[in-house]
């Protein structure tokens, strides 16, 4: 009884906050039967919220002097549209890709922004709702590698779709075995070059997809850990120091990191969106 009631150590606190609410207990590093229910639920809710905000902006838009909300949305839409035009030169493709890029930016920004909530706020509320003081809940979907790799894999699939749509199946297949080293009139050399080119293409696709997802995950995971350490500093202040010096330091450190983190979450959403546009633009180009 006493063992269950003791306050968690710093390592126990961090480990607990890094555990997901899952459908079944994970038994290995790679287990496709495991679903991180918290990441799925939060990402879906934020996706619906993002769509509602953009719908509301379109619904309330006026032709007169725009309000602050409309002006901010118009600036965002114009920024994304300019980036889409710079990377996607096919006007027909842009009709789908530009709104997709806007959706990606807004969705990832909202998921990243969950990191600004107090570390224990939603987990404690969830524990109270379930009646389980040890219930797990992580609320930053982009700090979950399965989420970010899922997003980057979706971009990879779109790259395949547009490569086939623009170049045709034959044209894309020819590109896979002739780029980047070309081919040869000699059948033996042509076969060797074809195998090498295909391997290089596979490596390139895998590397781009993994780095695309890992970049977002790494930044958000690190940010989440920093917030946990700041929260632990507040706990240490309450237990070890009389007065208000360390608690004030805890508040100041948390505020400074939160302000800096606003830049990080925005920048990471922008980078993911830009790489999406760049990769889809490359799918339109002949190599």
UniProtKB/Swiss-Prot annotation:
Sorted UniProt keywords: ATP synthesis, Cell inner membrane, Cell membrane, CF(0), Hydrogen ion transport, Ion transport, Membrane, Transmembrane, Transmembrane helix, Transport
UniProt topology in membrane: Multi-pass membrane protein
GO MF annotation list: proton-transporting ATP synthase activity, rotational mechanism
One GO CC term, this protein: plasma membrane
Transmembrane segments: 37-57, 96-116, 144-164, 187-207, 224-244, 266-286
PANTHER family given in the database record: ATP SYNTHASE SUBUNIT A, CHLOROPLASTIC (PTHR42823:SF3)
Places the protein is found: Cell inner membrane
Keyword hit for Acetylation: no
Principal location listed in the UniProt entry: membrane
Function: Key component of the proton channel; it plays a direct role in the translocation of protons across the membrane.
One Pfam family of this chain: ATP-synt_A
GO biological process, one term: proton motive force-driven plasma membrane ATP synthesis
Family: Belongs to the ATPase A chain family.
Organism (species): Acidovorax ebreus (strain TPSY)
Protein name: ATP synthase subunit a
InterPro entries assigned: ATP_syn_F0_a_bact/chloroplast (IPR045082), ATP_synth_F0_asu (IPR000568), ATP_synth_F0_asu_AS (IPR023011), F0_ATP_A_sf (IPR035908)
Subunit structure: F-type ATPases have 2 components, CF(1) - the catalytic core - and CF(0) - the membrane proton channel. CF(1) has five subunits: alpha(3), beta(3), gamma(1), delta(1), epsilon(1). CF(0) has three main subunits: a(1), b(2) and c(9-12). The alpha and beta chains form an alternating ring which encloses part of the gamma chain. CF(1) is attached to CF(0) by a central stalk formed by the gamma and epsilon chains, while a peripheral stalk is formed by the delta and b chains.
Gene name of the encoded protein: atpB
HAMAP family: ATP_synth_a_bact
């Amino acid at each position: 009884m006493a063992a269950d009631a003791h306050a968690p150590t710093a390592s126990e606190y961090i480990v607990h906050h890094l555990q997901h609410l899952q459908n079944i207990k994970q038994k290995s590093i790679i287990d496709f039967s495991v679903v991180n229910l918290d990441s799925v639920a939060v990402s879906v809710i934020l996706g619906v919220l993002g769509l509602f905000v953009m719908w509301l902006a379109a619904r309330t838009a006026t032709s007169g002097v725009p309000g602050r909300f409309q002006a901010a949305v118009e600036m965002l839409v114009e920024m994304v549209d300019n980036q889409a035009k710079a990377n996607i030169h096919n006007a027909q493709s842009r009709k789908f890709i530009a709104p997709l890029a806007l959706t990606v930016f807004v969705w990832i920004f909202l998921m990243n922004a969950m990191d600004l909530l107090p570390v224990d706020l939603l987990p404690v509320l969830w524990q109270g709702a379930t009646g389980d003081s040890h219930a797990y809940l992580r609320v930053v979907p982009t700090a979950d590698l399965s989420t970010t790799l899922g997003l980057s894999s979706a971009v990879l699939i779109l790259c395949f779709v547009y490569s086939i749509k623009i170049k045709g199946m034959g044209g894309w297949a020819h590109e896979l075995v002739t780029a980047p080293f070309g081919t040869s009139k000699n059948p033996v050399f042509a076969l060797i070059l074809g195998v090498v080119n295909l391997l290089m293409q596979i490596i390139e696709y895998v590397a781009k997809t993994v780095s695309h997802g890992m970049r977002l995950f790494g930044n958000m995971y690190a940010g989440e850990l920093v917030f946990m350490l700041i929260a632990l500093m507040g706990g240490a202040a309450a237990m070890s120091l009389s007065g208000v010096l360390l608690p004030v330091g805890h508040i100041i450190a948390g505020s400074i990191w939160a302000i800096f983190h606003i830049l990080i979450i925005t920048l990471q959403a922008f980078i993911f969106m830009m790489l999406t546009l760049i990769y889809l633009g490359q799918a339109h180009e002949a190599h």
